[in-house]
Curated annotation (Swiss-Prot):
Any one GO biological process: cell division
GN (gene name): mraY
Principal EC category: transferase
The protein's name: Phospho-N-acetylmuramoyl-pentapeptide-transferase
Organism: Clostridium acetobutylicum (strain ATCC 824 / DSM 792 / JCM 1419 / IAM 19013 / LMG 5710 / NBRC 13948 / NRRL B-527 / VKM B-1787 / 2291 / W)
Keywords: Cell cycle, Cell division, Cell membrane, Cell shape, Cell wall biogenesis/degradation, Magnesium, Membrane, Metal-binding, Peptidoglycan synthesis, Transferase, Transmembrane, Transmembrane helix
Cofactor(s) of this protein: Mg(2+)
Keyword Cell wall biogenesis/degradation: yes
Amino acid sequence: MGVIIYSVLISFLFSILQGPLFIPILHKLKFGQPIREDGPKNHMKKAGTPTMGGIIFITTAIIAMIIMRKNLNSNAVFAFVCFFSFAMIGLIDDSLKILHKKNEGLTSKQKFLLQIIVSAAISYYAYIRFGSDTFIPFLKITWTLPPIVYMAAVVFYFVAVTNAVNLTDGLDGLASSVTILVVTFFTVVSFSWHQYELSVFCGIIVGILLGFLKYNSYPAQIFMGDTGSIGLGGAVAAIALVLKLPLLVIIVGGIYVIEVLSDIIQVSYFKLTGKRVFKMAPIHHHFEKLGWHETKVVSVFSIVTVILCLIAFLSLI
């Protein structure tokens, strides 16, 4: 347990120290976040807020992994590689947005293709390394999938989780707060299941986000960008996969799921009827339109995530 605490503290320290160094540089380089014109009007004041904060995640994770290398194994390295690979996709997307000076990076097809390629490589390695067993929450049984079905499911899973976390990153501190709770849950589970090295990696991610939240909470001084949100999605997906608990992400990451479903429902219903189900999607914007302040949305979504984590614990008992 002491090693996990060290991993949290080390990554927290390097994360929080990089803020004052990194944010002014991004300002000077004019690496500001373009704001979607059809979004909430009160978000327009955020235009120009530095983005690509996910670079802090990458540098801190690398430093922490090196420092904690004696307490890590191939499972932890696998989770890091997944995090890093998806963060690189996000970095490309963020770079293009800044280059174009608009909220337009990779096209949906380009981003989807890159995610498919990375996920396919991950799925093949995961099958070879971990097999195709998947734990079913509440039923407490293990389901063994045929190789092709397993690898296809893993591809879908990674693409879904990374995009879900990306969609959740729409309010100051929202994705950071929710993901801290989700990864803390997996820290406890991995430790209790004797996956000590993986729990150290989880601790690194938690520490990074705790430090970053100092600058990302309302009013945000920096955004994590796609570099951070897609990278975090890769980390969450990988951690759960190593534990053979990908289905549990549906529960602990319930906010991610709701964000995606609200977007799908909104688009599908509008195409069919020309009307909207929500005032705006993803659903965090719907609550803003109802008059909720950003901080209230983040607080309520975090509380919901705590409850979902408790339910998830019950599914494993």
